[in-house]
């Protein structure tokens, strides 16, 4: 059962680190966009469009981290091997 405990721990840490990085990246992107708009209000349309594309790319990293963590939790390819090993050790 330690295998499943470690899978849950790995998924939790992976998701935490994935969202931490994307949160910091999105904050810095919005900060730069607001500074650029305050310096040149005429370019706010281009800045907003570029910022939205950048935020979508940054957010995709968090979605990839979520997908990997869900695979670790629910579709782990090593689950059967770990269960067989646990049964053989218990006998």
UniProtKB/Swiss-Prot annotation:
* Main location group: membrane
Site residues by UniProt (Reversibly protonated during proton transport):
59
Q: Which GO terms describe its cellular component?
A: plasma membrane; proton-transporting ATP synthase complex; proton-transporting two-sector ATPase complex, proton-transporting domain
The stretch of residues making up the signal peptide is none
Subcellular localization(s) per the UniProt record: Cell inner membrane
Give the Gene Ontology MF terms in alphabetical order.
lipid binding; proton-transporting ATP synthase activity, rotational mechanism
Q: Which domain of life is it from?
A: Bacteria
Quaternary structure? F-type ATPases have 2 components, F(1) - the catalytic core - and F(0) - the membrane proton channel. F(1) has five subunits: alpha(3), beta(3), gamma(1), delta(1), epsilon(1). F(0) has three main subunits: a(1), b(2) and c(10-14). The alpha and beta chains form an alternating ring which encloses part of the gamma chain. F(1) is attached to F(0) by a central stalk formed by the gamma and epsilon chains, while a peripheral stalk is formed by the delta and b chains.
The family this protein is said to belong to: Belongs to the ATPase C chain family.
The identity of this protein, by name, is: ATP synthase subunit c
Q: Which organism is it from?
A: Citrifermentans bemidjiense (strain ATCC BAA-1014 / DSM 16622 / JCM 12645 / Bem) (Geobacter bemidjiensis)
Instruction: Recall the taxonomic lineage recorded for the source organism.
Output: Bacteria, Pseudomonadati, Thermodesulfobacteriota, Desulfuromonadia, Geobacterales
